[in-house]
UniProtKB/Swiss-Prot annotation:
One of its GO terms (molecular function) is tRNA-uridine 2-sulfurtransferase activity. This is tRNA-specific 2-thiouridylase MnmA. GO terms for cellular component: cytoplasm. It is found in: Cytoplasm. Disulfide bonds join 98-195. The lineage of its organism: Bacteria, Pseudomonadati, Pseudomonadota, Gammaproteobacteria, Enterobacterales. Keywords: ATP-binding, Cytoplasm, Disulfide bond, Nucleotide-binding, RNA-binding, Transferase, tRNA processing, tRNA-binding. It comes from the Bacteria. The record marks 124, 340 as: Interaction with tRNA. Residues 145-147, 307-308 are annotated as: Interaction with tRNA. Its EC number is 2.8.1.13. It catalyses: S-sulfanyl-L-cysteinyl-[protein] + uridine(34) in tRNA + AH2 + ATP = 2-thiouridine(34) in tRNA + L-cysteinyl-[protein] + A + AMP + diphosphate + H(+). ATP binds at residues 7-14, 33, 123. Residues 93-95 are annotated as: Interaction with target base in tRNA.
């Protein structure tokens, strides 16, 4: 009997994943990871409640639950990288980092080496398919819940040891199963936002770790419109929190961030979500991962997702070097944010991805500083 360690988060997806693997004949055990040390603002931290729910789930399913603390690894490999990216003017994706560095690295190693597992499993909405002795990562059946965007860094050795039992189910079906099993998580809300921030105000949380300096907000013509509260608090395409809503150049459209200059501490804005300064067809991607391990040597046509739950866009990929790609979209897209992930697909198959480092607006944004 093959042994599977299921990452039990205290949510409905992982609890149903564990039950499904039991039905498939695996020897199932649970593991709860603590990735963030509780601070003095306990009302914002759900880890104690999640652990309690994890115990309840495992008791109901009659499986053992292991606990492990990866807070140090998370701090060094996820949170510090997250902070450095924000300080550099990027908008990072900590979920991608967490999957790469914690769930499918430290958790996988711990399960295989310390707990003697054959596989690990999680409640991600993705599927795997074995094609010509290579494992392909595929989108989950539920298009609204597909999480392949967050798993593009996985390699063949990792995928060979991973099971994703709910990838062929819809969220509705998962909740229905949980209710039939009387699991405590059946009606539990999905977690949203950045896990270590929880319900806290993003700006106040980040200011505890990053030195913040207010600066000018200017429009694309160089006119000063107001003051920003610190460049790291803003991302390309952001509308809220600018506090310049009453200022207009005549078209009455809301203001959006179209560029950030870290060196001069200046935020540049323009009006309208489809402003040419916010729209792009071309961008550069680095830190490349190919799921099948093949290095791209010639241009290909595929589709790309530039943020979670956004529709894929047809594109051409041109390799500039082993770790740098030029992406040309079939049609312009608004608010491409450097620091976010660009994930590539051929139909339902996730083939890889990387980190957006630069975008090229439809019209050049002139320097006035």
């Amino acid at each position: 009997m093959k042994k599977v360690i299921v990452g039990i988060s205290g949510g409905v997806d992982s609890s149903v994943a564990a039950w499904l693997l039991q039905q498939q004949g695996y020897l199932v055990e649970g593991l709860f990871m603590k990735n963030w040390e509780n601070d003095d603002e306990k009302e914002y931290c759900s880890s104690e409640e999640d652990l309690s729910d994890a115990w309840s789930i495992c008791n109901t399913l009659k499986i053992p639950l292991h606990t492990v603390n990866f807070a140090q690894e998370y701090w060094e490999n996820v949170f510090q990288v997250f902070l450095q990216a924000y300080q550099s003017g990027f908008t990072p994706n900590p979920d991608v980092l967490c999957n790469k560095e914690i769930k499918f690295k430290h958790f996988l190693d711990f399960a295989l080496e310390d707990l003697g597992a054959d596989f690990i499993a999680t409640g991600h909405y993705v599927r795997c398919m074995n094609v010509k002795k290579k494992i392909t990562l595929m989108k989950g059946i539920d298009q609204n819940k597909d999480q392949s965007y967050f798993l593009y860094t996985l390699n063949q050795q990792q995928l060979k040891r991973c099971l994703f039992p709910i990838g062929s189910l819809t969220k509705l079906t998962v909740r229905k199963i949980a209710k039939e099993l009387n699991l405590i998580t059946a009606n539990k809300k999905d977690s949203t936002g950045i896990c270590f921030i929880g319900k806290r105000n993003f700006r106040s949380f980040l200011s505890n770790y990053i030195a913040i300096q207010p600066g000018d907000i200017i429009n694309i013509h160089g006119n000063k419109l107001g003051l920003h509260q610190g460049i790291p608090f803003y991302t390309i395409g952001q509308r809220k929190g600018l506090n310049i809503g009453g200022i207009s150049n005549g078209n009455g459209k809301p203001w959006y961030v179209v560029d950030k200059n870290i060196t001069h501490n200046v935020l540049i804005v323009a009006q309208g979500i489809n402003h040419p300064c916010l729209m792009s067809r071309i961008f550069i991607v680095q830190k490349i991962f190919w799921i099948k391990g093949n290095i791209l040597k010639s241009p290909i046509q595929c589709s790309v997702k530039i943020r979670y739950q956004q529709s894929d866009v047809q594109c051409q990929i041109y390799p500039i070097s082993v770790d740098t790609l030029k992406i040309i979209l079939k049609q312009p897209v608004t608010a491409i944010a450097p620091g976010q992930s660009a994930v590539f697909y051929i139909k339902k198959h996730c083939i890889g991805g990387g980190t957006i480092i630069k975008r090229f607006p439809l019209i050049h944004i002139k320097n006035y500083y």
